[in-house]
């Protein structure tokens, strides 16, 4: 008798695994961005912002954009319009998050140059 583990597996359409991974990274980046905006604009605790991890965050966002772009290319090959729409939406959200993060970093650099 073989012992078989019961493992729940997700079956995504072709290309949706990359899109799902990009969506999870988007939510992670959104949480970090909201925390940094809160520390920068509301509480003025600049030392609690994620300055030390800027390179890692930007690299992670570029990887997320690449995964979303590859997922949208796979979704374009399918006939399903919903998969294509969701993949392109996630790609646009990741691109917008990248530019929001970049603008926040430039604002923080400008503030540090003026006040320190």
From Swiss-Prot:
Cytoplasmic-side segments: 1-16, 73-84
Membrane topology designation: Multi-pass membrane protein
GO CC terms of this entry: CatSper complex; motile cilium
Protein name (database record): Cation channel sperm-associated auxiliary subunit TMEM262
InterPro entries in UniProt: TM262
Keywords: Cell membrane, Cell projection, Cilium, Flagellum, Membrane, Transmembrane, Transmembrane helix
Originating organism: Homo sapiens (Human)
Extracellular side: 39-51, 108-116
TM helices/strands, residue ranges: 17-38, 52-72, 85-107
Disulfide bridge map: none
Location within or outside the cell: Cell projection, Cilium, Flagellum membrane
Record text on subunit structure and interactions: Component of the CatSper complex or CatSpermasome composed of the core pore-forming members CATSPER1, CATSPER2, CATSPER3 and CATSPER4 as well as auxiliary members CATSPERB, CATSPERG, CATSPERD, CATSPERE, CATSPERZ, C2CD6/CATSPERT, TMEM249, TMEM262 and EFCAB9. HSPA1 may be an additional auxiliary complex member. The core complex members CATSPER1, CATSPER2, CATSPER3 and CATSPER4 form a heterotetrameric channel.
Functional note: Auxiliary component of the CatSper complex, a complex involved in sperm cell hyperactivation.
């Amino acid at each position: 008798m073989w012992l078989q583990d019961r493992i729940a597996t997700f079956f995504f359409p072709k290309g949706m695994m990359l899109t799902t991974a990009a969506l999870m990274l988007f939510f992670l980046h959104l949480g970090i961005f909201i925390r940094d905006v809160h520390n920068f604009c509301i509480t003025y605790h600049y030392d609690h912002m994620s300055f030390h991890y800027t390179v890692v965050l930007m690299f992670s966002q570029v990887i997320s954009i690449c995964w979303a772009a590859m997922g949208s290319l796979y979704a374009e090959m399918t006939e399903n319009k919903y998969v294509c729409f969701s993949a392109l939406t996630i790609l646009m959200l990741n691109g917008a998050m990248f530019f929001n993060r970049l603008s926040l970093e430039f604002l923080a650099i400008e503030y540090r140059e003026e006040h320190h």
